Regions:
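P-loop (Walker A) phosphate-binding loop of NTP-binding proteins
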Residues: 41
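Catalytic core of pol beta-like nucleotidyltransferases
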Residues: 1-35, 44-49, 60-109
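A short, structured beta-strand/loop element
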Residues: 49-51, 55
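Conserved histidines in hydrophobic membrane contexts and catalytic metal-binding motifs
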Residues: 38
Length: 109
């Protein structure tokens, strides 16, 4: 995948994104990530070329995972996929947001 999230001139598919995320799992786990999911337009399959990749990040309950770690996760995923990434801690979602994205979520690991 190139820096625009394209493979050989075509937009990257949801399945290709998930495969890349699973390949990066060891690096993400080294950052403290215990679970990862995608949601939003890339998960639904209706993303445009400029759409970002929305991630839900899970960490161990008492870990010292910081905003810097979350930014590190974004950088790892951006490098692997060529997509702009917006990472959110799953535990930080309020009830309304959880309900809004529930149907979009695809667990990666």
């Amino acid at each position: 995948m190139n820096a625009e999230g394209r493979v050989a001139g075509r937009a990257v598919t949801r399945e290709e994104i998930i495969a890349k995320l699973r390949e990066t799992a060891p690096d993400l786990r080294a950052e403290g990530v215990t679970g990862l999911a995608i949601f939003g337009s890339r998960a639904r399959g209706d993303a445009r070329q400029e759409s970002d990749l929305d991630l839900l990040v899970e960490v161990a309950p008492r870990s010292k995972f910081s905003m810097l770690n979350l930014i590190g996760v974004e950088h790892i995923v951006e490098a692997a996929t060529g997509l702009r990434v917006q990472a959110t801690m799953r535990r930080s979602l309020d009830k309304r947001m959880r309900e809004r994205i529930a149907d979009d979520i695809i667990e990666v690991f």
